[in-house]
Each structure stands twice: as C-alpha cells, then as structure tokens.
Amino acid sequence: MRRYIYLLLFVLLVCGGIVTSCSRHEVRFHIGVSQCSDDEWRHQMNNEMLREALFYDGVEVEIRTVKDDNARQAEDIRHFIEAGVDLLIVAPNEAEPITPVVEEAYDRGIPVIVVDRRILSEKYTAYVGADNYEIGKAIGKYVANMRHGKGTGVEIAGLAGSTPAIDRHE
C-alpha cells in the first residue's frame, strides 16, 4: 500500500511539474507571409518557414495564400499591417496592384521582404529572387545562336503583370 502512495505522489509531482512548466506561448515576433499562389514549391517554402520558426521561442509565422487573386492579396497585406507584424514577406501575384499596399507597409516601418516577383517600387527592405532581366537576355542569346541569327522566334511568357514575365521580355 505504501508503495502505491509513493507512486501516486511521484505521478502527481511529475504531472504538477509538467502543468506548471507549460506556460502560455508568448508571441514576441510576428511574421506575416502573403503568398500569391499555392503551387507545390510555394507550399514547400511555407512548410520550411513554419518548421524553422519552431526553433525560436516567441516567433509566430502567419501565412495567407490568395490563389492568384490580387484584391485578396492586397486585403491580406492590409490585415498584416493592421495586426502590427514585425516582418512582412510578400510574393506578389502581379506587381501593379500589389505595389501600393507593400509601399504602405514599408512606409509604416515594417521591414518587407519581396520574394520571387518584384514590385514596381524600391520601397522594400530586401528582394529574394532571380535576375529575370539577365535570364531573358541569356535565353534570347541562346535561341539566336541556335538559329544562327536567322528565322523568327516565339516568346512564351508567364503571367502578363508579373515582374518575371516583364523583365524576361525586356
């Protein structure tokens, strides 16, 4: 009987320690992520950001994906501004409709990282993506060399309002 009492006391002590050590998660750094679409590589990027945030106490990552809807993306970015995020990460769907709201976030002092597609302004903290102008130039030279400077080519472009399509065309 005495053994069961000691075992019960031990279990209560352990459970009490677990309960008291489980404090409420305090968010000290809120990251807002606005994704333009939910294709596989963006889905993987989201998972990696969420996984990385697990290594840091107090970091919360909130991801919103708009499935190629400019108006919804602008609304989501405004949501992040009003929520007072500490960092905003934006993968713009199209540059023109998203630029003003990204500028608003930047003007309010929120660091903004633009990913994959640029905006039509320099009002962002950092850009992570390809040099699409150079990519377009290299592809053009490659095709011209293959055709020995003769014939006509056809350009297949991406989303008309996206900066990769614009830059690669130039």
Where are these regions (language model features)?
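A residue-level marker of the well-folded mature domains of exported/periplasmic proteins
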Residues: R3-Y4, S21-E170
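Bacterial N-terminal signal peptides
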Residues: L8-G17
